[in-house]
């Protein structure tokens, strides 16, 4: 692996020179190549946990606990699950910041008599203050990099690595050797993209959708489906869009000139899929107008009022 130059960029940028998403990806892989991540093991703690998160935290929870007999929920419906599913014997809250909805979820879970585990990147968070802190499994705190608000790349990637055990150095080298060297098309020709991913990574779909929403809003249209689901009437109405396939080659969808293939490592896990997916989206970000960079400062001021506490455009 190269010297950790991307971490240096992340440690020094300002709102005047916000880096693209690929810097956060490579910086995260640099971080986890030198700092170990906790191993999440709650199989002996809970028999039927409720896994709760907001946005990409919810998606991360689904990935981490995909092989567990668990119930999944967001901030919008978790209390309904607690009310009606009596088999739930504990609540796992996934939250990078441990703020916003997280402390509300913890308080509500305890109101229903459920033990709570917090998976986070922030020590001494508002949610952490609500925990029992009587067991080693009450809180898992993962390392993270300094990043633009909402990028949440090192945060959730670390949690996924703590579950999959993938080697971040191998992922980093694969990106540098096999992805960064691709002659990417002129993405500015397209404002519609269709990402096709291997079926075994269906859990990443929500994370990629959210990243498109955060970076481009409704300025760029996107669909993201698996190789199996794309067969189900998703292209009835044709469009001048770029089809980007990950792993397998797309020989069926879109005009041949509107297809881009992105390779994956042969033994890729969810962390590799996340890193390569985000890195690819960053190439689109580089070529389109800087929608995110121009709006993030104003947005954090607006949303601070909604959550009634300061949310900054740079997460230290």
Please identify what each model-predicted range represents.
Residues 1-36, 150-153:
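Cofactor-/ligand-binding subdomain signature composed of acidic, glycine-rich
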Residues 10-16, 21, 152-190, 292:
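YjeF_N-associated NAD(P)HX repair module
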Residues 44-173, 246-263:
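Glycine-rich phosphate-binding loops that contact phosphosugars or nucleotide phosphates
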Residues 170-171, 219-223, 288-297:
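Flexible, glycine/charged-enriched surface loops at secondary-structure junctions
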Residues 175-183, 229-239, 296-315:
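Short, mixed-charge aromatic SLiMs
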Residues 263-316:
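Charge-biased C-terminal accessory regions appended to nucleic-acid-, cytoskeletal NTPase
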């Amino acid at each position: 692996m190269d010297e950790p130059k991307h971490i240096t960029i992340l440690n020094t940028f300002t709102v005047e020179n916000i880096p693209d998403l690929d810097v956060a990806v490579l910086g995260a892989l640099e971080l986890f190549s030198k700092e170990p991540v906790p191993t999440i093991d709650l199989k002996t703690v809970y028999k039927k946990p409720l896994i709760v998160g907001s946005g990409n935290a919810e998606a991360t929870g689904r990935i981490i606990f995909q092989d567990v007999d668990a119930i999944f929920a967001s901030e919008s419906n978790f209390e309904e699950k607690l009310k009606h599913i009596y088999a739930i014997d504990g609540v796992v809250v996934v939250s990078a910041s441990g703020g916003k909805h997280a402390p509300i979820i913890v308080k509500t879970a305890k109101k229903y008599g459920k033990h709570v585990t917090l998976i986070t990147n922030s020590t001494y968070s508002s949610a952490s203050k609500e925990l029992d802190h009587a067991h080693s499994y009450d809180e898992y705190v993962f390392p993270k990099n300094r990043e633009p608000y909402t990028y949440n790349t090192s945060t959730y990637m670390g949690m996924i690595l703590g579950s999959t055990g993938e080697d971040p150095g191998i992922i980093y080298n694969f990106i540098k050797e096999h992805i960064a060297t691709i002659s990417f098309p002129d993405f500015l020709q397209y404002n519609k993209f269709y990402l096709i991913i291997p079926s075994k990574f269906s859990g990443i779909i929500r994370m990629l959708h959210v990243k498109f929403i955060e970076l481009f809003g409704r300025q760029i249209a996107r669909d993201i489906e698996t190789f199996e689901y794309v067969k189900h009437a998703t292209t009835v109405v044709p469009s001048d869009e770029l089809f980007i396939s990950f792993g397998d080659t797309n020989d069926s969808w879109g005009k041949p000139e509107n297809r881009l293939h992105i390779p994956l490592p042969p033994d890729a896990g969810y962390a590799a899929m996340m890193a390569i997916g985000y890195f690819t989206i960053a190439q689109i970000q580089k070529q389109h107008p800087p929608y995110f960079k121009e709006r993030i400062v104003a947005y954090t001021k607006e949303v601070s009022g909604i959550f009634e506490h300061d949310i900054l455009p740079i997460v230290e």
